[in-house]
Curated annotation (Swiss-Prot):
Gene: XDH1
Residue sites binding [2Fe-2S] cluster 1 per the record: 53, 58, 61, 83
Cofactor binding note: Binds 2 [2Fe-2S] clusters.
GO cellular component: plasma membrane
UniProt-recorded name of the protein: Xanthine dehydrogenase 1
Origin: domain of life: Eukaryota
Length: 1361
C-alpha cells in the first residue's frame, strides 16, 4: 500500500485502501492490481454482475459507481463496465451492483419490478446490466429523465432475446413525461399500450374490462395505469446512501502491486505525476482503462507500471474565457458532453459551432458506460486512426498543451500532433495536460461525420471533422480558412492539406464543390490492400462527407446571404440527421384461457430472480474446493500437419497443473452429434484456425489462459479451402451429403416452351454469430472416488453432453450426469457445439479426480463454436408473362466447415423451405454440404429455413423486376392454398396464409405506405424509402423422425404443490413457464403451486435437444400426459368426496396410498420423410406469418433505419401471448441483424488483409448485433385470431423460429429504397444485393457521382461465404 511522502514520492508505508460495495465496507489488500472490478465482485459472491464479453461491448457487467466530487461537494453516480474497470480505480468509492437494489425476499426495486412485469427479461443474462444502467441514470438525474435520455443510457447494453421493445417500455414509465403513457395514443408520441389486465392483475395489452375465457387484446382499447403502479410500494428496503466515511476521507496517493509484477500508482497532484513519469517513462497512463484494458486482455500486452491520473486535479481543470475553453486531459467524455451542452445554451450561437459538432459526435461515441470513464487525453494519445474525436479536434483549430517532467509547457496544433500509426508528437517524458478549443467566429462552421456498421456504440469505418471560415465580400462569400480532417482512411487521423489549400480564397459556390471533390480524390488516397478493407466504400465516404458538409454550410449561410447559390430542396435531406425517436410498439392478440393458467400472459417464472441477479448460470455456480480452471490450446492455422507440441514454457507458468492431449484421453477421441468425424483433441492434422489441440488446467482462469498461450505448436502448413466456391471448384464436400428433391418435370417444363421467360442467377448470404450473452461453459467433477462424473453445463442438449463425456472417458452413460438450470441464450449455438467443451473439461477432471471449470472467453467462443451457415444458391426459374411460376431448378450449397455436425440437417431444411409459400408445379433441388477449413458451422434459429426462403424471395423479386410488377403482386398470385402439395409431397392443411396476409396488408395500410414512400422519394435525392411485405411458412418438427419424442416427470406433494422436471432447457424462451402453465391448468391449481426444476439427465433420460421450435409442443404434451396419469389415479377418490382444495384431495390420495408421481411421454405423430422415395410428412404442421417493413436509407453513406415494422403470425391459441410476442419481437430483431448488420469477416480471398482462416469479427468490438437504436421506430405485433391448431397442445403453435425470416422484409425494403436511388441515375435493371445489407453494400449499390470515381455501377463488395 502506498502513501505520499514529504518529498512527493509514493512510498511503501501501509495506509488502508478501501471501497464500499452495496453499503458494506471492504478493505482492499495489496496484490490485486491485475484484477478488474468484475472479478472482485464475483469473487465476493456477487455473481449478478455478468461477464459477457470482457471488452466493455455488451453491458452485462454494468454496475453503478458513486464518488465524491470535491469541487461541487456532492456525490456523483454513474454506470461503468466492471469488466474493464481496474479494481483499484474505484478505491475510495461506493460500488452498487444489482444485489444492492432489491431482492425477492425484501422486495424488488421499482426498476426491477417494472422490467419483470413488462416481460423485459427472457434469458436474463443481460438483465442486471440493463437495470443498473437505468438505475444509474435515475440516481444521477435531478429530474425525471426524458425518453431520449433513457434510450441513450441503454445504448451500451446489448440484448439478444427481447428485441428491446419491452425493455424500453418498462423503463419509459420513469420519464413521467406523459399522462397518457400507457393509455393509448399519447399527445406526445405513440406508446406501447400496456395495461393492467383484470385477468392477471399484471401489465399486458388486452384492454379487457373483465376476466373472460376468451378476451381480445386490441390496440384500440386501453386501461390506464400510471407510474404509481410500479413506484415501489412493495419495496421495503432503502436506497443505499453514499457512505459518510468516504465524504470525510482524504484522497491519498496509492502504490499497489499485482500479479506479473504490475505496479499501480495513483498520484493526486500534477507534480507527483510528473515525478512518476520521470521515473517510469514507459508507464501507461490511464483513467478509464477502456483502451489499456483491452490491450492487456485481448492482445495479451504486458505493462509493468500503470499510473491512474483520474484524481489529478490539474488534469481535470476547466477554464472558460473569451477566447475559448480549456479542458483537462483527464476529463471524462460524459463530463465533456455535459459541458458542451451547457455552453451551447449559454454562449452566442456563432461561438459554439465546434461544441455542437462535438455534442453530436459524442452521442454516438461508444456507450454510456465507456463515456463515463474514458477521458479526452486517452482518446487523443492513443492516436487511433479511427478516433471519432481527433478529426474534430484537428478541424476545430484545437491546441494540445503538453508538459514535461520539468514542468515546461508547450502547445501544438491538433492537426500537427499525429505522426503515424499510434504515434504522436509527445516524448516519453511528456504528458498531455489540456486541450484548448477556440470559439468559432461568425460565418465559421464546424461539422462532424461518422459512418459505422452500427450507429450506437461502434467504431467508425470512416469519420471526419470539417471546418470552413467564410468571408463576406458583398454578394459573395469566400473561403478565408478551412480544415478537412478524416479518420479511417490512413494509419493516422489526417488533414486533407491539398484540399484545404485549394479551398482558401475561393468563392463558395457549386463550381468550388465540384473542383474540391476532384482534389480530395488525389489528396486522400487509400491503398488497395489497406487494413480494414472496404476500400471503395471508404473512398466514396470521403467525397460523400465533403458533399454533405458543403450542403450543410450552404444551408446555414443561405438565410444570412441570399446571394449564395442554393441547392434544390430535394438535396437538403442529405444533411438531416437520423432522428432519435422513442421506440414504440403495440401488441394485438386474443387471450383464450384454458383452466387456471394456460392462455394467460404470465410473467416468465424466473423474471424476478433475473432482475435481482439471483438467477444462477453455469459460471455463477459455486465451485467445489480444489477446483481447477481450464483453457484450450488452439490451432493458429487453417490447415496443417502438426510437427511438434512443446509445453516446456507452459510448465514454468504460474499455477500450471497440466496439459492434456489426445494421447491422454481414456476413451475415444472421435466425436460428433451424428457422424463421429471430428477429433476432440487434434492429433496429426488441424483443419481450421481454432481447432482444439489440447487443454491446459491451472489454479485460475487467467493462469490457465496464460499457460495455454505458452504451449508451442509447430506446423507444416497445407492448402486450405476458404469459401463455398473454392469448395465447389475442388469438389470438397462432406461424404454422403448430396440430397435431392423433385416434383414434376423441370427439364420438360423448360424445354416445352411453357415458360414465357427464364431467369438464372446466384444468391449468396453470409453467416451469423449466435452471440448468446452467456458464453459457453461447463463445470465438471467426479463423484464416489472418481467412478462417476457430474457436470453443470450451459447447453441446449444435456443428453449430448452426457453422451460425449461418456464416450470420451469410456464410461457408461449411467455414470455420467449433466444438469442445466438455465442458459443465457442459445439460439441453436449450444445444441451440439457446446458438447465438446464439456468433454474436453472432463478429461483432466477424470484423470486428476478434481473439479474442472472451463468457461470460454467471448472471442474464443465466437472463433471456435460455429455460426449460422453461409449459403450459395444457383437458381433457374421459369414463369409466364403474367408472373405465374412454373419451374424451379436450384442448386444449393452450405458451408459446413471442418466437420459435419448438423450441416446436413440444416441443408435439408433449407431445401424443404426453398418454396417458402409458393406453388411451383415443377421443382428440382440438389443440395451439398461443403467441407471448408473453417470451424464447423452449426444450428442457428431457423436451421437453414431462412436461408432457403431468402434464396426464394430473391428470385421472386427478380421476377417482379423482369415483369415490371410489384413483388407483392407476384407473391400473391403464386401463394399456396389449402390442399397444396409441396415439392416434398406434404399436403398443406389449415393453411391460414391468405387470411393472415390480407389482414396484415390492411392493418399496415400497405398501399398507402408505398404511395407515401414514392412521394418521399420524388422529393428527396439523397434519402430514399422503401417498403416491403414478406410471408413465411415454417415447418414444425425435427426433420429427423426419432428426435420427435419428449419425456417429463411430475411429482405431486402432500402440500398440494407440484414439481415438474422435463427434458427441455430454459434458455429464455419461456419453456418452463409454459410447461408450468400446462401443469397448473391440468390440476386446476394456481401457477404459483407449480415449480419446474433443473433439466437433468438422471431425471429425464435420452432427451432431444431443446430446438426446432417444438419444445413447448413436445414437453408440454409430455407434462400433460404425466398430469393426466396422476389425475386418473386421483379420480376415484375425487369422485367420492367434495374437497375444498387440491391440497385436501392430494392428502386424501396419499393416505389411500395412491402414486402421486408419473412419467409422461409424448411422441409426435404422423411424421417421417423418406429421402429415397421423396415421400412422407417432414413436419407436423406449419406456422404461418407475414411482415411489413418500411426503411429509410442515406444513399451517400449507406446508413439506414427501420421506420416501421408490422408482424402478424398464426399461433393458434397461444399458451402465453406475452411470451410469444416476446419471441416474435426478439426473433425479428435478431433476423434484422442477420439481413442488415451482422457480417462475419474471415481471412479469405475476399479479405486478404486478415490472416488466412482467422475470424476478425470475434467480439462486440468488430461484430455488431442490433442495439436498442436499431429496433424499428414502430414495432407492432399481431396474432391471428380465431384459428386453433388441432395438432399441438391446447391448440397452440410453435413460435421460436418462424418469425426470424420475417425480418427479411427489412432487407427487401432496403433493396426497394436502393432501387429508387439507382433510378435517379438511370439504372433501372434488376440488381443483386447480398445479405447482410450493411452500410457498405447499401451505399455502393446506390451508384452516383461520388462512387463513380472508384467503381462501376455493377460493383458489389466482397462477402465471406
Amino acid at each position: 500500500m502506498g502513501s505520499l511522502k514529504k518529498d512527493g514520492e509514493i512510498g511503501d508505508e501501509f495506509t488502508e485502501a478501501l471501497l464500499y460495495v452495496n453499503g458494506v465496507r471492504r478493505v482492499l489488500p495489496d496484490g490485486l492490481a491485475h484484477m478488474t472490478l468484475l472479478e472482485y465482485l464475483r469473487d465476493l459472491g456477487l455473481t449478478g454482475t455478468k461477464l459477457g464479453c470482457g471488452e466493455g461491448g455488451c453491458g452485462a457487467c454494468t454496475v453503478m459507481v458513486s464518488s465524491y466530487d470535491r469541487k461541487s461537494k456532492t456525490s456523483v453516480h454513474y454506470a461503468v463496465n466492471a469488466c474493464l474497470a481496474p479494481l483499484y480505480s474505484v478505491e475510495g468509492m461506493h460500488v452498487i451492483s444489482i444485489e444492492g437494489l432489491g431482492h425477492r425476499k425484501l422486495g424488488l426495486h421499482p426498476v426491477q419490478e417494472s422490467l419483470a412485469s413488462s416481460h423485459g427479461s427472457q434469458c436474463g443474462f443481460c438483465t442486471p446490466g440493463f437495470i443498473m444502467s437505468m438505475y444509474s441514470l435515475l440516481r444521477s438525474s435531478k429530474n425525471s429523465p426524458s425518453e431520449e435520455e433513457i434510450e441513450e443510457c441503454l445504448a451500451g447494453n446489448l440484448c439478444r432475446c427481447t428485441g428491446y421493445r419491452p425493455i424500453v417500455d418498462a423503463f419509459r414509465v420513469f420519464a413521467k413525461s406523459d399522462d397518457a403513457l400507457y393509455c393509448g395514443v399519447s399527445s406526445l408520441s405513440l406508446q406501447d399500450g400496456s395495461t393492467i389486465c383484470p385477468s392477471t392483475g399484471k401489465p399486458c395489452s388486452c384492454g379487457s374490462k373483465t376476466t373472460n375465457e376468451v378476451a381480445s387484446c386490441n390496440e384500440d382499447r386501453f386501461q390506464s395505469i400510471s407510474y404509481s403502479d410500479i413506484d415501489g410500494a412493495k419495496y421495503t428496503d432503502k436506497e443505499l446512501i453514499f457512505p459518510p466515511e468516504l465524504l470525510l476521507r482524504k484522497l491519498t496517493p496509492l502504490k499497489l502491486r499485482g500479479n506479473g509484477g504490475i505496479t499501480w500508482y495513483r498520484p493526486v497532484c500534477l507534480q507527483n505525476l510528473l515525478e512518476l513519469k520521470a521515473n517510469y517513462p514507459d508507464a501507461k497512463l490511464l483513467v478509464g482503462n477502456t483502451e489499456v484494458g483491452i490491450e492487456m486482455r485481448l492482445k495479451r500486452l504486458q505493462y509493468q507500471v500503470l499510473i491512474s491520473v483520474a484524481q489529478v486535479p490539474e488534469l481535470n481543470a476547466l477554464n472558460v474565457n473569451d477566447n475559448g475553453i480549456e479542458v483537462g486531459s483527464a476529463l471524462r467524455l460524459s463530463e465533456l458532453l455535459r459541458l458542451f451542452r451547457k455552453i451551447v445554451k449559454e454562449r452566442p450561437a456563432h461561438e459554439t459551432s465546434a461544441c455542437k459538432a462535438f455534442i453530436e459526435q459524442l452521442k454516438w461515441f461508444a456507450g454510456t458506460q465507456i463515456r463515463n470513464v474514458a477521458c479526452i487525453g486517452g482518446n487523443i494519445c492513443t492516436a487511433s486512426p479511427i478516433s471519432d474525436l481527433n478529426p474534430l479536434w484537428m478541424a476545430s483549430r484545437a491546441e494540445f498543451r503538453i508538459t514535461n517532467c520539468n514542468g515546461d509547457v508547450r502547445s501544438i496544433p491538433a492537426k500537427d500532433f499525429f505522426l503515424g500509426y499510434r504515434k504522436v508528437d509527445m516524448g516519453s517524458n511528456e504528458i498531455l495536460l489540456s486541450v484548448f478549443l477556440p470559439w468559432t467566429r461568425p460565418l465559421e462552421y464546424v461539422k462532424e461525420f461518422k459512418q459505422a456498421h452500427r450507429r450506437d456504440d461502434d467504431i467508425a469505418i470512416v469519420n471526419g471533422g470539417m471546418r470552413v471560415f467564410l468571408e463576406d465580400k458583398g454578394q459573395q462569400l469566400f473561403v478565408s480558412d478551412a480544415s478537412i480532417a478524416y479518420g479511417g482512411v490512413a494509419p493516422l487521423s489526417l488533414c486533407a492539406r491539398k484540399t484545404e489549400e485549394f479551398l482558401i480564397g475561393k468563392n463558395w459556390n457549386k463550381d468550388l464543390l465540384q473542383d474540391a471533390l476532384k482534389v480530395i480524390q488525389s489528396d486522400v488516397v487509400i491503398k488497395e490492400d489497406a487494413p480494414g478493407g472496404m476500400v471503395e466504400f471508404r473512398k466514396s465516404l470521403t467525397l460523400s462527407f465533403f458533399f454533405k458538409f458543403f450542403l450543410w454550410v450552404s444551408h446555414n449561410v443561405n438565410n444570412a446571404n441570399s446571394a449564395i447559390e442554393t441547392f434544390p430542396p430535394s438535396h437538403m435531406s442529405a444533411v438531416q440527421p437520423v432522428p432519435r425517436l422513442s421506440r414504440i410498439g403495440k401488441q394485438d392478440y386474443e387471450t383464450v384461457k384454458q383452466g387456471t393458467s394456460v392462455g394467460s400472459s404470465e410473467v416468465h417464472l424466473s423474471a424476478r430472480m433475473q432482475v435481482t441477479g439471483e438467477a444462477e448460470y453455469t459460471d455463477d455456480t459455486p465451485v467445489p474446493p480444489n477446483t481447477l480452471h481450464a483453457a484450450f490450446v488452439l490451432s493458429k492455422v487453417p490447415h496443417a500437419r502438426i510437427l511438434s507440441i512443446d509445453d516446456s514454457a507452459a510448465k514454468s507458468s504460474s499455477g500450471f497443473v497440466g496439459l492434456f492431449l489426445a494421447k491422454d484421453i481414456p476413451g475415444d477421441n472421435m466425436i460428433g452429434p451424428i457422424v463421429p468425424d471430428e477429433e476432440l483433441f487434434a492429433t496429426d492434422v488441424v483443419t481450421c484456425v481454432g481447432q482444439v489441440i489440447g487443454v491446459v488446467v491451472a489454479d485460475t482462469h487467467e493462469n490457465a489462459k496464460t499457460a495455454a498461450g505458452k504451449v508451442d505448436v509447430r506446423y507444416e502448413e497445407l492448402p486450405a479451402i476458404l469459401s463455398i466456391k473454392e469448395a465447389i471448384n475442388a469438389k470438397s464436400f462432406h461424404p454422403n451429403t448430396e440430397k435431392r428433391l423433385r416434383k414434376g418435370d423441370v427439364e420438360l417444363c423448360f424445354q416445352s416452351g411453357q415458360c414465357d421467360r427464364v431467369i438464372e442467377g446466384e444468391v449468396q448470404m453470409g453467416g451469423q454469430e449466435h452471440f448468446y450473452l452467456e458464453p459457453n461453459g461447463s463445470l465438471v467433477w467426479t463423484v464416489d472416488g472418481g467412478s462417476e462424473v457430474h457436470m453443470i453445463s450451459s447447453t441446449q442438449a444435456p443428453q449430448k453432453h452426457q453422451k460425449y463425456v461418456s464416450h470420451v472417458l469410456g464410461l457408461p452413460m449411467s455414470k455420467v450426469v449433466c444438469k442445466t438450470k438455465r442458459i443465457g441464450g442459445g439460439f441453436g449455438g449450444k445444441e451440439t457445439r457446446s458438447a465438446f467443451i464439456a468433454a474436453a473439461a472432463s478429461v483432466p477432471s477424470y484423470l486428476l479426480n478434481r473439479p474442472v471449470k472451463l468457461i470460454l472467453d467471448r472471442d474464443v467462443d465466437m472463433m471456435i463454436t460455429g455460426h449460422r451457415h453461409s449459403f450459395l444458391g444457383k437458381y433457374k426459374v421459369g414463369f409466364t408473362n403474367e408472373g405465374k411460376i412454373l419451374a424451379l431448378d436450384l442448386e444449393i450449397y452450405n458451408n459446413g466447415g471442418n466437420s459435419l455436425d448438423l450441416s446436413l440437417s440444416v441443408l435439408e431444411r433449407a431445401m424443404f423451405h426453398s418454396d417458402n409459400v409458393y406453388e411451383i408445379p415443377h421443382v428440382r433441388i440438389v443440395g451439398n454440404v461443403c467441407f471448408t477449413n473453417f470451424p464447423s458451422n452449426t444450428a442457428f434459429r431457423g436451421f437453414g429455413g431462412p436461408q432457403g426462403m431468402l434464396i426464394t424471395e430473391n428470385w421472386i423479386q427478380r421476377i417482379a423486376a423482369e415483369l415490371n410488377k410489384s413483388p407483392e403482386e407476384i407473391k400473391e398470385m403464386n401463394f399456396q392454398v389449402e390442399g397444396s402439395v409441396t415439392h416434398y409431397c406434404q399436403t398443406l392443411q389449415h393453411c391460414t396464409l391468405h387470411q393472415l396476409w390480407k389482414e396484415l396488408k390492411v392493418s399496415c395500410n400497405f398501399l398507402k405506405a408505398r404511395r407515401e414512400a414514392d412521394e418521399f422519394n420524388s422529393h428527396n435525392r439523397w434519402k430514399k424509402r422503401g417498403v416491403a411485405m414478406v410471408p413465411t411458412k415454417f415447418g414444425i418438427s425435427f426433420t429427423t423422425k426419432f428426435m420427435n419424442q419428449a419425456g417429463a416427470l411430475v411429482h405431486v406433494y402432500t402440500d398440494g404443490t407440484v414439481l415438474v422436471t422435463h427434458g427441455g432447457v430454459e434458455m429464455g424462451q419461456g419453456l418452463h413457464t409454459k410447461v408450468a402453465q400446462v401443469a397448473a391448468s391440468a390440476f386446476n391449481i394456481p401457477l404459483s403451486s407449480v415449480f419446474v426444476s433443473e433439466t437433468s439427465t438422471d431425471k429425464v433420460p435420452n432427451a432431444s435437444p431443446t430446438a426446432a421450435s417444438a419444445s413447448s409442443d413436445m414437453y408440454g404434451a409430455a407434462v400433460l400426459d404425466a398430469c393426466e396419469q396422476i389425475i386418473a389415479r386421483m379420480e376415484p377418490v375425487a369422485s367420492k368426496h367434495n374437497f375444498n382444495t387440491f391440497t385436501e384431495l392430494v392428502s386424501a390420495c396419499y393416505f389411500q396410498r395412491i402414486d402421486l408421481s408419473a412419467h409422461g411421454f409424448h411422441i409426435v405423430p404422423d411424421l417421417g420423410f423418406d429421402w429415397i422415395s421423396g415421400k412422407g410428412n417432414a413436419f407436423r404442421y406449419y406456422t404461418y406469418g407475414a411482415a411489413f417493413a418500411e426503411v429509410e436509407i442515406d444513399t451517400l453513406t449507406g446508413d439506414f433505419h427501420t421506420r416501421a415494422a408490422d408482424i402478424m403470425l398464426d399461433l393458434g391459441y397461444s399458451l402465453n401471448p406475452a411470451i410469444d410476442v416476446g419471441q416474435i419481437e426478439g426473433a425479428f430483431v435478431q433476423g434484422l441483424g442477420w439481413v442488415a448488420l451482422e457480417e462475419l469477416k474471415w481471412g479469405d480471398a475476399a479479405h486478404k488483409w486478415i490472416k488466412p482462416g482467422s475470424l476478425l469479427t470475434c467480439g462486440p468490438g468488430n461484430y455488431k448485433i442490433p442495439s436498442i437504436n436499431d429496433m424499428p421506430f414502430n414495432l407492432n405485433v399481431s396474432l391471428l385470431k380465431g384459428n386453433p391448431n388441432t395438432k399441438a397442445i391446447h391448440s397452440s403453435k410453435a413460435v421460436g423460429e418462424p418469425p426470424f425470416f420475417l425480418a427479411s422484409s427489412v432487407f427487401f425494403a432496403i433493396k426497394e429504397a436502393i432501387k429508387a436511388a439507382r433510378t435517379e441515375v438511370g439504372l433501372t435493371d434488376w440488381f443483386p444485393l447480398e445479405s447482410p445489407a450493411t452500410p457498405e453494400r447499401i451505399r455502393m449499390a446506390c451508384f452516383d457521382e461520388f462512387s463513380a470515381p472508384f467503381v462501376n455501377s455493377d460493383f458489389y463488395p466482397n462477402l465471406s461465404v
